[in-house]
Amino acid sequence: MRVSDFAKLDVAREARTGMPEVVLAEGKLDHHLVEIVKAFATRKARVLVSRLAPDRLALFEGMPHLAYHESARLLVVGKEAPPRTGGRVLILAAGTADVPVAEEARLVAQELGCETRVAYDVGVAGIHRLFPELDAADWADVVIVAAGREGALGPVVAGLVDRPVIGLPVSTGYGMGGKGEAALLSMLQACSPLLTVNIDAGVVAGLCAAQIANRVAGARESPGESEPLESGARRA
């Protein structure tokens, strides 16, 4: 779908991948952004706009059914709530400064139909705060861990739970290794099994978590459709 001479919209992405296209506000000219969002809104029930600064919200004045989540800088355009899939995502944040990126991931996972639970400010500097929250991992299909500074919470959680864990490094921290660099490298070098996305990539973490959780939910609802293989067996 073409929008003037500056955009070609992928309106079939959700049908192909199960994941909607999210409009990145950052870096776009105001009039380009507005025209893209309006064009999507004519074709899709809901449109997500990420990294939208609060002072740009006025650009969409007059458009119906807007929900702006300031902490996550995420705008949702659309009236119909997304259908529930049964997917379950737990989001942990090491510190309060990591919450905005964690919230971006949470809201995106919810937009893909998942139920979410959160536990914030449970970082390793006071690791006793973490342990009571891990009971929720038994409920979850996948866990997202948002952490800045040294990023240690991601590898720690991945070594404690039997669910897929997505590490979400956050650009908190300063000096050598600051702005999320140390957190990213720590998560990439983890010896515990940890999937890692880019710095501040809350949208990507939320999309990937929802994709995993929704597949698990489908298997939970139809347990007989795919029989598990015995250890060492190969499917014909």
Residues of each region from the PLM?
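C-terminal binding/interaction regions
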Residues: T172, M176-R220, L229, R234-A236
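Glycine-rich phosphate/diphosphate-binding loop of Rossmann-like nucleotide-binding domains
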Residues: T85-H128
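Short glycine/serine/threonine-rich phosphate/pyrophosphate-binding segments
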Residues: L33, D98-E103, I127-H128, A147-V157, ...
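Glycine-rich phosphate-binding loop
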Residues: P132-V170
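Long amphipathic alpha-helical segments
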Residues: M1-A67
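Short, acidic/small-residue loops that bind anionic groups at enzyme active sites
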Residues: H69, V157-G180, T196
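Glycine-rich oxoanion-binding loops at beta->alpha junctions
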Residues: L74-V76, E115-A136, E181-A182, V197
